[in-house]
Amino acid sequence: MAENAYSKAGVDVEAGYQVVERIKKHVARTERIGAMGALGSFGGMFDLSSLNLKEPVLVSGTDGVGTKLLLAIEADKHDTIGIDCVAMCVNDILAQGAEPLFFLDYIATGKTDPVKMEQIVKGVADGCEQAGAALIGGETAEMPDMYGADDYDLAGFTVGAVEKQKLITEGAVQAGDTLIGIPSSGIHSNGYSLVRKIFFKDNEFTLDAEISELDVPLVEELLKPTRIYVKPVLEVLKEVTVHGITHVTGGGFVENLPRMLTNDLAVKVELGSWPMLPIFDVVKKYGQLNEMEMYEIFNMGIGMVLAVAKSDVEKTLEVLVQNGEAAYVIGEVTTRESNAVIFAGGKKG
């Protein structure tokens, strides 16, 4: 009787049960040392003592995917958007030197489609595997009065740990440090309200539009998952004293690079020191944006930046390459005279 009444209110309890069964195999893939309990418990659990840290500091992060979700919904492609959600969270706590331990997701939708929900959680689990984090819990909320039947929102939450003496804070970066950039896969998960306006409103492209500068259809390019930098950067942290890390997200170079600096420092970025991905030229062209706007909004092909002493540059590059990462020396830290970010060198973009 109660279930029938709930169904009449638009909530499909049976579909929720189906989702749980469908996602179990994906959650199981993310198991790691320290993870405790079973799917369906009231709370997710993690045994911090399993890490053998002397003075553990917990670092937490939460984020969503923004309006990139609208492209996934319109394209009916849901199996990678979860990677974006994980990436946005774990890359942020990595900037403090933390190893991601576990992850939880939150999905709100107008109508629970078990197949779609499984695809979303599959992506979350894929991201957790890349990050080495256990998926220990989550919530799927069916709210027909708040969302359309095909609509959903996705958010994530992660917790990591680092030894207190190895915690990375803005006070460690010094004038003379070298900036090492690690490439992005594309736009990642920021700036999509503008990107969607440029391509689909102002220029009326279709999702499957073929643009000469791109080697895949437009929507495929725009849905490329955000890269997860956890494993290669953790390897660097074992070998090198990294002074600062920036996750280049919303606000691009201009807003994010200063976040690892004290007020007396600036960064000098050598333009042309890394390969520019074609998607940024395409966005600039069709959006009629200037150079500074691009660097204020997008990652411009660099998703993470490490600040290291000059004496550690060679070792840092070596470890990254050994772990399958391309990496580029893209600039240096200087004393600040005016702007916190200075662009110099070759052609912008």
From Swiss-Prot:
GO terms for biological process: 'de novo' IMP biosynthetic process; adenine biosynthetic process; purine nucleotide biosynthetic process. It comes from the Bacteria. InterPro entries: PurM-like_C_dom (IPR010918), PurM-like_C_sf (IPR036676), PurM-like_N (IPR016188), PurM-like_N_sf (IPR036921), PurM_cligase (IPR004733). GO terms for molecular function: ATP binding; phosphoribosylamine-glycine ligase activity; phosphoribosylformylglycinamidine cyclo-ligase activity. Its main location: cytoplasm. Keywords: ATP-binding, Cytoplasm, Ligase, Nucleotide-binding, Purine biosynthesis. Its EC number is 6.3.3.1. NCBIfam families: purM (TIGR00878). This is Phosphoribosylformylglycinamidine cyclo-ligase. It comes from Listeria monocytogenes serovar 1/2a (strain ATCC BAA-679 / EGD-e).
